[in-house]
Amino acid sequence: MNLKEVFDFYKGKNVLVTGHTGFKGTWLSRILVNAGANVTGYSLNPPTDPALFDMAGLDGKMNSVIGDIRDLVHLKQVFEETKPEIVLHLAAQPIVRDSYKDPVYTYETNVMGTVNLLECVRLAQQQGNAPRSVLNVTTDKVYHNNEWAWGYRENEPLDGFDPYSNSKSCSELATHSYINSFFADKAVAISTARAGNVIGGGDFANDRIIPDCVRAMAAGRKIGVRNPYSTRPYQHVLEPLAAYLLIAQRQYEDNRYAGYYNVGPDECGCVTTGTLVDLFCQAWGDGAAWENRAEA
């Protein structure tokens, strides 16, 4: 990706980022601010303590709106006030295990939150203020799991198993419905992006492999790994963000780029979780070790 080209494109544009206080959302907001975009964020308060958002130097450099993606009235107000040209939808309940604890909240946030956002786009179109480019960020877990050895193409059936994955499958289907029902002329270019497991600086969330490794080392205990033999498409956080920015840019410039995108490493770049933790232990040194805590 040509970073200068991306920065030149986003400079001065009105961009709405939902979920801007989260891990990906903070990094994305920081990049857009650096590019000179007029950034509005809409999100709950930072989900962790400490929080990357509080460390990122964004105070006073963007319009940070604290709100719930389930609140259609508030979200609609933000659309009307900011008139975004580009919308990057990252707001979500992103943790698989939390989706088992509270599936209703997960579906409300990940499905109805997406519907609310798309409804705001539809209403903005009626008023002549529609954004030109909208990207719904989902996950590579939206696909029906066929237990095969190769990757999934964008046209594979969507049928996530657990509440988180399934809610993201539903988010995709809601997006498809809105595209076909209200934006078939592609006056608003809408895409979805399906990225896998992300690592990188500033991630303090629970049930994330690298933060869990660091917490274990800080506590002087072995790292517990639940699925050490599962292969995952781990990627650095800046890699999918670069893809999101490029997709949003390209479809803004040419609506033929609107579609559904897998975002991840080549097959040779995918490793098992155990291999990743081995690499972490080698880098950490000082007797770092892990143990298999596979869940029944």
Q: Where in the sequence are the language-model features?
A:
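C-terminal structured domain segments across diverse proteins
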Residues: 156, 174, 190, 195, ...
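N-terminal Rossmann-like NAD(P)+-binding domain of SDR-like oxidoreductases, especially those catalyzing
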Residues: 1-195, 282
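Residue-level signal for the nucleotide or nucleotide-sugar donor/cofactor binding architecture
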Residues: 70, 101, 109-112, 162, ...
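C-terminal substrate-binding subdomain of Rossmann-fold SDR/epimerase-dehydratase oxidoreductases
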Residues: 34-37, 67, 197, 217-296
